[in-house]
Structure formats: C-alpha cells, structure tokens
C-alpha cells in the first residue's frame, strides 16, 4: 500500500517539504473530477513550488489552481 498525505487548497510553502515527490491533484475549476492530474513537485525559476504535469511537459500547476493534492511518500 502506498502512503500519501492529502492537502486541501495548498499554499506553495505546503509543498516545499515534498520537492521531487509524485502527486495527484484536482483543479479548482473541476472540484468534482477525481484526481485526474498528476506530476512531480518541483520549483520554478523563482523558487516557488508547483506541480510539473507528467502528461504534458508544458503544464505547470501552481498552488492557486490546485483544489486538493495527494502527495505520495
């Protein structure tokens, strides 16, 4: 069984301890959609934590658009 934590409406500092971890998340635009988006938590060029989507290289999800996130340990 994989361990994970769930955070609702995360701020970038909530993601800081998990840089490099795999995560699944829901968008604030689609709160009823299951965890359909996934990627790894990284830092952008300004040092802000975000999720780099694994399905699309150019998609970055910043904390302002994440409704809920599961971070796998």
Role assignments for model-derived ranges:
Residues 15-66:
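Acidic, low-complexity, intrinsically disordered interaction modules
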């Amino acid at each position: 069984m994989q361990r994970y934590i769930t955070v609702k409406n995360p701020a970038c500092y909530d993601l800081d301890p998990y840089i490099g971890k795999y995560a699944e998340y829901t968008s604030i635009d689609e709160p009823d959609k299951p965890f359909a988006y996934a990627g790894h938590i990284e830092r952008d060029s300004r040092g802000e934590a975000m999720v780099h989507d694994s399905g699309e290289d150019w998609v970055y999800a910043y904390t302002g658009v994440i409704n809920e996130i599961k971070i796998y340990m």
